[in-house]
């Protein structure tokens, strides 16, 4: 009796270990769905540290949708770090939309960091990207701001390695600025905003990107400010400041030159005073040496007195002329 109890306990423990190690419920679900999966396959997944549910559940979903996938394909993608369920959903959506998307390509897109399911949905339902206001200056100096709506469709063939939405927005912005800048007058942009769309769309801006541009529509156009007039005003102000600086420089040089001339005048006056101080000494020396007689000395004094008297008369005459009113 005791031996029978031990055998029953061993069997129960074995069954418990089996059910905990092997997802029997998942295996039954797969068999019920018509997916042939062996117990050994599930055990092998456990040994390879693969969650059987994350492989078998997408496999059942794919089988029901009519996709011919294998456990090896799904397990390989799982081990590579991919999202198996999302790739299978993308394959099912692509099949329903009649889009050619092999599992290997979908797996590559998923491993590249792209949302493959969203890409398939964008291929069916295009996405609208709205740009911020982009400013450009027309030839007459008026700044014009334009906002565009870009309708794009995902290009599944270029999802791996193709540029994203930021590149599309940057290229469209560059095209808008170029088109506005080539307009002779800002009114041309206001009257025909569709010219911007046509010009930008004709440049093939979706080259090298993961999208195909379907249309570019100008949503809004605004007049900002007169950049040309502002630049002219700033240039005039700069020229004025330069002229004032040069005038101030010339004035400073003139003042410096005037002060220099005054210093030279004072220097010459000091030399004259110094020379006049030596005249009496020279006359005394001439008298002592006999080169100048007493008579000559008095004649010189008379000439000096006569010259001083004439200068005094001339000064009084000039003062009277200045004080008399003009006739």
From Swiss-Prot:
Keywords: Cell membrane, Membrane, Transmembrane, Transmembrane helix
Region (Disordered): 305-327
Biased composition (Basic and acidic residues): 318-327
CC annotations in GO: membrane raft; plasma membrane
Any Pfam family: FloA
InterPro entries: FloA (IPR022853)
Main location: membrane
Key word Membrane present: yes
Transmembrane stretches, start-end: 2-22
Membrane topology summary: Single-pass membrane protein
Domain of life assignment: Bacteria
Subcellular location: Cell membrane; Membrane raft
Keyword Transport: no
Function of the molecule: Found in functional membrane microdomains (FMM) that may be equivalent to eukaryotic membrane rafts. FMMs are highly dynamic and increase in number as cells age. Flotillins are thought to be important factors in membrane fluidity.
Subunit-structure text: Homooligomerizes.
Family: Belongs to the flotillin-like FloA family.
Protein name: Flotillin-like protein FloA
Organism expressing this protein natively: Staphylococcus saprophyticus subsp. saprophyticus (strain ATCC 15305 / DSM 20229 / NCIMB 8711 / NCTC 7292 / S-41)
Highest classification ranks of the organism: Bacteria, Bacillati, Bacillota, Bacilli, Bacillales
């Amino acid at each position: 009796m005791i031996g029978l109890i031990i055998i029953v306990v061993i069997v129960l423990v074995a069954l418990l270990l089996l059910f905990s190690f092997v997802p029997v419920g998942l295996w039954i679900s797969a068999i019920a769905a018509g997916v042939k999966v062996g117990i050994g396959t599930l055990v092998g997944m456990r040994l390879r540290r693969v969650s059987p549910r994350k492989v078998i559940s997408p496999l059942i979903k794919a089988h029901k949708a009519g996709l011919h996938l294998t456990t090896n394909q799904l397990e390989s993608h799982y081990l590579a770090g991919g999202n198996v369920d999302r790739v299978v959903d993308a394959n099912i959506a692509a099949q329903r939309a009649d889009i050619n998307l092999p599992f290997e390509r979908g797996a590559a897109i998923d491993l590249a960091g792209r949302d493959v399911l969203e890409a398939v949905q964008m291929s069916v339902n295009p996405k609208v990207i709205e740009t911020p206001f982009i400013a450009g200056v027309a030839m007459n100096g008026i700044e014009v701001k334009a906002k565009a709506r870009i309708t794009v469709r995902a290009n599944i063939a270029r999802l791996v390695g193709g540029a994203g939405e930021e590149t599309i927005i940057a290229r469209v912005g560059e095209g808008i600025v170029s088109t506005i800048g080539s307009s002779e007058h800002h009114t041309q942009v206001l009257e025909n905003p569709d010219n911007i769309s046509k010009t930008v769309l004709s440049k093939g801006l979706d080259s090298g990107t993961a999208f195909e541009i379907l249309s570019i529509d100008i949503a809004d156009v605004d007049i900002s400010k007169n950049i040309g007039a502002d630049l002219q005003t700033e240039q005039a102000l700069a020229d004025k400041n330069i002229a004032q600086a040069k005038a101030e420089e010339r004035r400073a040089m003139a003042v410096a030159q005037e002060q220099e001339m005054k210093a030279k005048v004072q220097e010459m006056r000091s030399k004259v005073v110094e020379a006049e101080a030596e005249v009496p000494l020279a006359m005394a020396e001439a008298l002592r040496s006999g080169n100048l007689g007493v008579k000559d000395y008095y004649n010189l004094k008379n000439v000096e007195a006569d010259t001083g008297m004439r200068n005094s008369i001339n000064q009084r005459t000039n003062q009277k002329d200045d004080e008399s009113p003009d006739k």
